[in-house]
Amino acid sequence: MRQVAFYGKGGIGKSTTQQNTAAALASMGYRLMVVGCDPKADCTRLLLRGVRQPSVLDTLRDVGPESVQLEKVVVQGYGGVKCVESGGPEPGVGCGGRGVITAIQTLETLGAYKDDLDYVFYDVLGDVVCGGFAMPIREGYAEEIYIVCSGEYMALFAANNICKGIKKFAERGYARLGGLICNSRLVENERALVEEFARRLNTKMIHFVPRSKDVQRAEINKKTVIDYDPELPQAHEYRELARKIDENDEFTIPTPITQDELEDLMREYGIVD
């Protein structure tokens, strides 16, 4: 069983990318569980065709830890993908990252990881790998990490910060970085920029996902692109990304760059003056 965490700047399309990749792997015959590690509890919405499932933390609050049952917090979605949302604390109370810890520990207690799974995906909130949201890495659940980014400055800034956190854990023998996924924003020289940025981080751009209105069309219909129309060119892109992740055997400890180096890189590729 391979355990994979997806990180990235808020709004970059991380959850969309993760769910489409999960759907692609499911269509290839793999068995998956997706654990949404975001208090918004929207990391599995497309796989569940818009159905909002009860989160682990909401269920714990409603019935208490002794009465929680696995079938109450694990819902089957597209292609048989098992979907879980960790949820979060009540507004203004508690720590969202702590909620991730509680949710994953609850899943383990309930035996969710004993199923015959090929992949577990963790869709993790956070521009920075803070203690709670780093839990899938720190506690040895996620073994490989992919960062979703674009050629925009703040997306690369966040990716670099995430790499700083990954580096700390990787040096202690925890997870490794599997690569960057460029979710295109049609930035000038975007592919070349992200490839060079990845090289400097001691990793690779595992796939360039082109911008497509079909992603939005599928989302309006509350589906992944694979589910909406598996023959679309964008569906092929997600299948290709899934194939590359499945075949990837190059995992590294990242080498983050300085902010000055990042700004110089942006200037080198004509992104900023």
UniProtKB/Swiss-Prot annotation:
Belongs to the NifH/BchL/ChlL family. [4Fe-4S] cluster binds at C95, C130. The key enzymatic reactions in nitrogen fixation are catalyzed by the nitrogenase complex, which has 2 components: the iron protein and the molybdenum-iron protein. Its cofactor is [4Fe-4S] cluster. The gene is nifH. The keyword 4Fe-4S applies. The modification ADP-ribosylarginine is found at R98. InterPro entries: NifH/chlL_CS (IPR030655), NifH/frxC (IPR000392), Nitrogenase_Fe_NifH (IPR005977), P-loop_NTPase (IPR027417). Pfam families: Fer4_NifH (PF00142). This is Nitrogenase iron protein. It catalyses: N2 + 8 reduced [2Fe-2S]-[ferredoxin] + 16 ATP + 16 H2O = H2 + 8 oxidized [2Fe-2S]-[ferredoxin] + 2 NH4(+) + 16 ADP + 16 phosphate + 6 H(+). GO terms for molecular function: 4 iron, 4 sulfur cluster binding; ATP binding; metal ion binding; nitrogenase activity. Binds 1 [4Fe-4S] cluster per dimer. Gene3D superfamilies: P-loop containing nucleotide triphosphate hydrolases. ATP binds at G8, K9, G10, G11, I12, G13, K14, S15. It comes from the Bacteria. Its EC number is 1.18.6.1. The reversible ADP-ribosylation of Arg-98 inactivates the nitrogenase reductase and regulates nitrogenase activity. GO terms for biological process: nitrogen fixation. Keywords: 4Fe-4S, ADP-ribosylation, ATP-binding, Iron, Iron-sulfur, Metal-binding, Nitrogen fixation, Nucleotide-binding, Oxidoreductase. Homodimer.
